[in-house]
Amino acid sequence: METASYKGAHMNLDYIKGVNLGNWLVLEKWMNPALFDGTTADDEYYLPTQLDPAVYEARIKTHRAEYINERDFATIKSWGLNSVRIPVPYFIFGDRAPFIGCIDELDKAFNWAEKYGLTILIDLHT
């Protein structure tokens, strides 16, 4: 019996060889405890309840701008990988106060992935 394999619309992938970009758009305290400094919050859900709104916003925006960037996508490609997994939160569009959406960062990731010939696996991770 022969089985068919899926080939991406723009890429010829026989195997997914990738890396997880966790803690970028969905915070994981165990991966970067510094984001939770000054709080007793254990996860992103409780973090904004324990920080001044301006501090929370600045911390999140700085983290998202610096934690993963285009250089990382170039490096991933140079390692011979062809895919990245990006966990995203349910508030990706920014419609759930006090959380800050991250659709702009995901859009950048798609542009970088296209530039470096990578595919993206989006994982709703909430």
What label would you give each PLM region?
Residues 1-81:
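N-terminal carbohydrate-binding accessory modules
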Residues 70-126:
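Substrate-binding cleft and catalytic face of glycoside hydrolase catalytic domains
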